[in-house]
Amino acid sequence: MKLKRAYSPGEVLNMKIPRYEFTGDWQASIGNPAKSGVWIIWGASGNGKSSFVMQLAKYLCGFGRVIYDSLEESTGLSFQMSLKRHKMDEVRKRLVILDRESMDQLEERLQRRGSPGIVIIDSFQYSGLNYKTYKEFKERHPKKLFIFISHAEGSHPAGRSARKVEYDADVKIMVSCFNAWCKSRFMEKPGEPYVIWEEGAAKTLKDDNMEDYLNGMGE
């Protein structure tokens, strides 16, 4: 078996690794992330997860074309209302919405020349992936950024496979109390909470265990 090339520290430091230059609240929460890899976002119902994902998708459209594969919610009324509430028509030229497109169909789409570089998959549980097929999928597309939305079980993604993805992901984001709590490999410490909805966040008591949770998030 042919071995892969080995590198010196200097060679790695001199590599030009593409990254996004985030600003403002997004940079404070996530840093300046690589343009490829995996993120995972999870949270209990009613805490602002859907709104956060829409806000994130809209922000990422400022950097390039984004696929949103709505596996769980489809393109029904609630999804339509969310698009309207966040004025997603403003990024209509860069946001590609897929109505429950299977992972096989999505894979075929991603193999096309010029396919979008950012892919939001909502949700991991509806994708049908397990940890093995997830790893194979992401390794076939090393230049893409995949953002998986997940159900929550306690303070972690729901299910064994999603929990493993939490540990594998470059950016892990838990949505709670209308805040997005981020832990990113592109920052030396957990980022500042991203406030999804100020009024809702102000009315919700702060979780006293949040600091302990952040310390226990997947590395």
Residue locations for each model-derived region?
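Charged, amphipathic alpha-helical linker segments immediately N-terminal to NTP-binding catalytic cores
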Residues: 1-16
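Pre-Walker A adenine-sensing motif
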Residues: 17-33
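Conserved P-loop
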Residues: 35-104
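Short, well-ordered alpha-helix to beta-strand connector turns
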Residues: 36, 63-64, 116, 143, ...
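Short acidic, S/G/P-rich loop/turn micro-motifs used as interaction or catalytic elements
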Residues: 47, 74-75, 103-104, 124-129, ...
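Short, surface-exposed basic-aromatic patches at helix termini and helix-loop junctions that form
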Residues: 59, 84-88, 111-113, 136-143, ...
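Phosphate-binding/switch loop-helix module in NTP-utilizing enzymes
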Residues: 97-149
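Phosphate-binding/switch region of NTP-binding enzymes
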Residues: 139-219
